[in-house]
Amino acid sequence: MSTTDTPLNASRLPGKIGIARKAKAYLALTKPRVIELLLVSTLPTMIYAERGFPSFGLILATLVGGAFAAGSAGAFNCYIDRDIDKLMHRTENRPLVTGEVTPREALVFSWLLGAAAIAILWFGANPLSAWLGLGAIVFYVVIYTMILKRRTAQNIVWGGAAGCFPVLIAWAAVTDTVEWPAIVLFMVIFLWTPPHYWPLSMRYGEDYRNANVPMLGAIAGAKVVSVQVVLYAWAMVACSLLLIPAGGAGWVYTVTAVVAGAWFLYESHALYNRAQGGDVSNKGAMKVFHGSISYLTLLFIALAVDPFVGSAIMG
């Protein structure tokens, strides 16, 4: 892996670029679409932990600190993976590949964003949430990006745990501790990550093979991947229901978890049936990918609404 400050694709290096374009390039380093998905789980978890709305200042600090932590991790990832990003069509326009940002600039930006995240969480929420934010960055950068991603097809399973930290950060920001409901939500996202990401890796399998990254969807056939998607989907839905006895969930969350879970299981089994019949397509795989986002969004919207409607089903 190159560690020089020379852009990987010098032929694409633009001349002097304007402030707006430079700012847009820095924003792209943070992977904003990933941040959006992570923040979907943050505010609902805070509301559920508080059983109402926390203070505006706490919400703002947690959302901004969490976004900065995720952005720092994403920028570090772009810096480390700049050698393989140029080999994949999906990532060939990232700023370090195009030369809009130099490796040195990206590295400094990553450190500054991470430091800001920890400071905001520490002083705006509490030290526990800051430590969890640091843990999320380290886990994603070191465990996933540097150790697992290029070595094992199970990379996204264990490395994906970094994406589960926002619920722990959110819960800790409100309660200054981590309790069973937060752990259940952590596990829901942990089990959600493979059936979310593996269909995407099926769609971009050629990219990952070109970069020699052993994503399961790239190195295993659709039959194998579809089995794993179904198994993780069932485990995820079952885990989501643990919030009823372990977290005092009410009817809004419960009904949503059952209905949305049943729908996602249907889509997962549809992918499985097509794959086993040799009729899987990129469109079918992406349907499950997009469906997983809808499922998680619905689940956490229900989590946010639940404290305001009725009472706990158990306890």
UniProtKB/Swiss-Prot annotation:
Molecular function GO labels: protoheme IX farnesyltransferase activity
Assigned keywords, A-Z: Cell membrane, Heme biosynthesis, Membrane, Transferase, Transmembrane, Transmembrane helix
Sequence similarity: Belongs to the UbiA prenyltransferase family. Protoheme IX farnesyltransferase subfamily.
Species assigned in the record: Arthrobacter sp. (strain FB24)
Transmembrane segment boundaries: 56-76, 105-125, 128-148, 155-175, 180-200, 213-235, 251-271, 293-313
CDD domains cross-referenced by the UniProt entry: PT_UbiA_Cox10
Gene that specifies this protein: ctaB
Protein's recorded name: Protoheme IX farnesyltransferase
GO cellular component, as recorded: plasma membrane
Keyword Cell membrane: yes
Reaction catalysis annotation: heme b + (2E,6E)-farnesyl diphosphate + H2O = Fe(II)-heme o + diphosphate
Pathway assigned in UniProt: Porphyrin-containing compound metabolism; heme O biosynthesis; heme O from protoheme: step 1/1
Keyword RNA-binding: no
Pfam families: UbiA
EC number in record: 2.5.1.141
GO BP annotations listed: heme O biosynthetic process
Membrane topology type: Multi-pass membrane protein
Misc remark: Carbon 2 of the heme B porphyrin ring is defined according to the Fischer nomenclature.
Compartments (UniProt record): Cell membrane
Alphabetical list of InterPro entries matching this protein: Protohaem_IX_farnesylTrfase, UbiA_prenyltransferase, UbiA_prenylTrfase_CS, UbiA_sf
Free-text function comment from the UniProt entry: Converts heme B (protoheme IX) to heme O by substitution of the vinyl group on carbon 2 of heme B porphyrin ring with a hydroxyethyl farnesyl side group.
